[in-house]
Amino acid sequence: MQKVTLDEIVGLERYEKIRDVFRRGIIELKKHRRVSVGDRVIFVFENQETVLFQIQEMLRAEHITDIDKVRFEVEVYNELIPGDGELSATMLIEITDQAQIRPELVRLLGIDQAVSLRIGNQFAVPGVFEGGRSTEDNLSAVQYVRFPLPIEARLAFCDERQDVRLAIDHPQYQAQAVLSSETRQSLAAEL
């Protein structure tokens, strides 16, 4: 999948003019790229468009205009874009009660070792999480995960007869979600 290039980034003034239309398009796109697994965990599968949007929004929020800083952010965010034969997602742990954030994250320590993409009964592809977002006593509520799919798993993923599920099998959190046909079609087009 193509990475975001510096040429695709628009200046803050121009971005303000196109932001509403761009944002609506991304919201529509993400409808088919968002998967809730249980009541606390959401995965949003990334691609070049979703990452471009995140970059533009971050530059807007931080008022970044310096070309070297923009270049740096593009390089950092491009790491979210899946490589060949991969899917990548942002995993969000939703905790709405402020008092429960720390205890809940401690309870879910190790969740980054418990996520897999299951394709039919043949493949259980473990999620590969970005390093540095969890330690033995700390867990970030936002995680970045990749699912490297061997060719056979990619073919099975595209076969509508096979169920595709995101699964979490953690001692404190067990849940699965079947990917909808729309989600699978959106993701399969990028494999």
Located regions from the model:
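Long, contiguous binding/interaction regions
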Residues: 1-86, 95-191
